Amino acid sequence: MEMFNKKELDKRIGPLKKNKKLYDLEAVEGYVIRKANENGLEHSYDVMAEEMPYFKTLAYTEYAGNFYLQPLNFKLRNEQLIDAYNDNSSEIVDYSSLLINRIVNNEANKYTGRKEEFSKYLPKDYLVVLPGSNKVRENVCLNRLKYISKQHGDNIYFKPHPITTHQIIGELKDFFGEENILPRDINMYYYLQKAKGIYTTHISESCIYGIVTGKKTEPIDVWNNIQRGSFYCINNHLLTHQHDAKSFINKTFSSYKSGIINPSVDINWKEKVDKYIDYICKKREVYKNWFIDNPPKK
């Protein structure tokens, strides 16, 4: 199990510590791994790759405090969100309130130890939420950031990800002014609540938090890399459903077809996992032997 394995976390996030609320998902991880094995599937935590539609690997990660299951195939993981939205068989659960309460109760941060030096950095009307150093150069459009900065002047903050190098932070200050760059360790969700508009990427949980709280939310991604992120297939649909965000979230996330699991609201979460794996395996079966990536055995 990788989601809460100390050695694995040390490699991925270094000295940062995950929010303790995420440990509620540990039982889900164990159950998912067992069910994947029973169905002849490999499993992988927080990894993106492109396999055939008859995929080998069931991927999983955390998303806005939820457990998120998806196959390592773009076509199928995008279709599962569409199928979930069109599913009328699942009881509707109030996921929107769950997400809003996470912000209000200061539980939305993925990492612990977020600083609250808010008096030093008074809120502004617009907030740009950036990914970590390993993603910011390849996923974020600098031309878009310059355009946004020109539009809002000094009425905007750029929030570096907690995993951001001093070099990147220095470059941000050079580009957009030191007074417009928030500390990487400050509580971003305080500023998200105060802002009128949010700019973020398709690979960030801040997208759903901005949208569910009614903030006008827009992307800052480079188009050519946009579909590679593990949250793209959720955030892409969310960005086009801002007018009915709460009902979209509730209907989609409540469906087992979404791959979203949360034991705090999904009373029969094991059944939801079972139904999801059965559903995605049936979709997978359609493509058996359609595309062959290894030469046939003689």
Where are these regions (language model features)?
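Leloir-type glycosyltransferase catalytic cores
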Residues: 71-124, 227-298
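A short, charged/proline- and glycine-enriched loop
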Residues: 1, 9-13, 120-133
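Short loop/turn segments at strand-loop or loop-helix junctions that form parts
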Residues: 46-47, 59-63, 124-135, 160-162, ...
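A donor-sugar binding/catalytic signature common to diverse glycosyltransferases
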Residues: 47-53, 185-231
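Short acidic, S/G/P-rich loop/turn micro-motifs used as interaction or catalytic elements
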Residues: 50, 133-140, 163-165, 206
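Catalytic donor nucleotide-activated moiety binding site of glycosyltransferases and closely related
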Residues: 6, 10, 14, 145-184
